[in-house]
Amino acid sequence: DFFRAYKDFSDRHIDAIEIMVSRLYEKWGISDTTDFGHLKPEDYPILSDLYDLIEEEYQGYDADAHQLYTAELLQEILLGLHSMCKGAEAKFFNGHTNVTSSRFIVFGVKGLLQANRSVRGAMLFNILSFMSDRLLTIGNTTAVLDELYVWLSDNITVGTTIIEYIRNILKRVRKKESNLIMASQ
């Protein structure tokens, strides 16, 4: 959903990206059995690592290997992700987390009103995913979505996805003794 919030990727694009993300984590030694509590931010790959892996796959593409994706599909993914991973928008997305304490976190989203749709949608989705994880995995957490209209983006696809995430959070937070508060003008 994060990549779809950024660009209008088809299901085929997302499926290929998921394969590449799995390979990237495997390359970094991260699996379902990894003890994430011992990992530092630098122990995780960043988006440029994903881009490099996809580019490597594209450059060495072997049509006879019966891949689940085509070279053309990889090229389209590279074009769609370039700005986020290597270009002008990489400053927003391509880096390790700078959250050093999780006791009280404020994400100021007012400045996102001036950002282009793809950046705004992806950044809001990133924040919502982080909040969802804290609310539903850690539990005993309160999150506030202020300026709700910003979250309900003018991009129909992103807005619908965000609404679904909010709805799913609201259905499950009580079981984790968490709260989601929404406000707007």
Q: Where in the sequence are the language-model features?
A:
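P-loop NTPase motor domains
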Residues: 1-178
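H-loop/switch region of ABC-family ATPase nucleotide-binding domains
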Residues: 184
